[in-house]
């Protein structure tokens, strides 16, 4: 799988959302260099970003008049940017919230891939597996040493995502069952930043999308009824991996023009091949 880039995680997620939207809006007035290119702005989830960027690169090779700009910022940024007309397509690694649908009544979402959320640790940590209950207790701050879950005698450093993250929202619902995260959690603004922290911190635990797994970190199998289930594409397809979710694209109303052509490409066999190449699960699998 490909190595993902990392980025700094600011302490104030709300400020980060506003800044991301301001920067995106500032780019809306820039004319195309040749006067003919069509610009498509896509923003949001850092989980979906690698797929969207790779698809955009391939798409633009065959559509020379297309200028597709893909940026991250988190799922909440993607939803808000589309709802307020700052971007044509939003990326999200979670379902739309009821309050978002109420605020932006014309939002339309389409699943473009499936994904699993891998629990990751430093490569030196050989904890054999974790149950869903153990993961919840760690992230709630009730389990603080790896020896209590079959690992080394070492303090657990909890690493998660900031409040703009769709991955965090899904993790909160599917793993935490809405229980509060420990206040000592280190909050990062991207999958890449989580991965980098885990790779540099022997006692750390984190969670990332399947496409971010590489040799720098170690994915931990999840113990499901005494069966150890690895975070793999095959197990997501088989529906045996317990932390899985769809990845979606969002438009304000039914997609039209370049946005529709791009989304049609992403859902085509060529686009779904890119989904697989980036380490995610094709929607048709």
Kindly label every feature range from the protein language model.
Residues 1-34:
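Secretory targeting signatures
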Residues 28-285:
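Exported/periplasmic ABC-transporter solute-binding proteins
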């Amino acid at each position: 799988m490909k190595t993902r880039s990392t980025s700094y995680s600011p302490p104030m997620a709300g400020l980060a959302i506003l800044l991301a939207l301001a920067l995106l809006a500032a780019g809306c007035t820039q004319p195309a260099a040749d006067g003919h290119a069509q610009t498509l702005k896509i923003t949001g989830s850092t989980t979906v970003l690698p797929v969207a960027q790779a698809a955009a690169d391939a798409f633009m090779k065959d559509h020379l008049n297309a200028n597709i700009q893909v940026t991250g910022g988190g799922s909440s940024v993607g939803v808000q940017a589309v709802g307020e007309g700052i971007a044509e397509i939003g990326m999200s690694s979670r379902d739309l919230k009821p309050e978002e649908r109420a605020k932006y009544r014309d939002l339309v979402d389409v699943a473009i891939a499936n994904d699993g959320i891998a629990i990751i640790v430093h490569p030196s940590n050989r904890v054999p597996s974790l149950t869903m209950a153990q993961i919840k207790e760690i992230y709630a701050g009730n389990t603080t040493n790896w020896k209590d879950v079959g690992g080394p005698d070492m303090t657990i450093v909890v690493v998660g995502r900031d409040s703009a993250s769709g991955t965090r929202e899904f993790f909160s619902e599917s793993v935490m069952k809405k229980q509060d995260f420990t206040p000592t959690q280190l909050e990062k603004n991207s999958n890449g930043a989580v991965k980098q922290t885990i790779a540099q911190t022997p006692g750390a635990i984190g969670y990332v999308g399947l496409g971010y797994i590489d040799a720098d970190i170690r994915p931990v199998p999840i113990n499901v009824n005494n069966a150890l289930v690895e975070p793999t594409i095959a197990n997501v397809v088989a529906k045996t991996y317990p932390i899985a979710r769809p990845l979606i694209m969002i438009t304000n109303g039914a997609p039209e023009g370049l946005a529709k052509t791009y989304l049609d490409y992403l859902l085509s066999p060529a686009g779904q091949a890119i989904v697989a190449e980036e380490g995610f699960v094709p929607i048709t699998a």
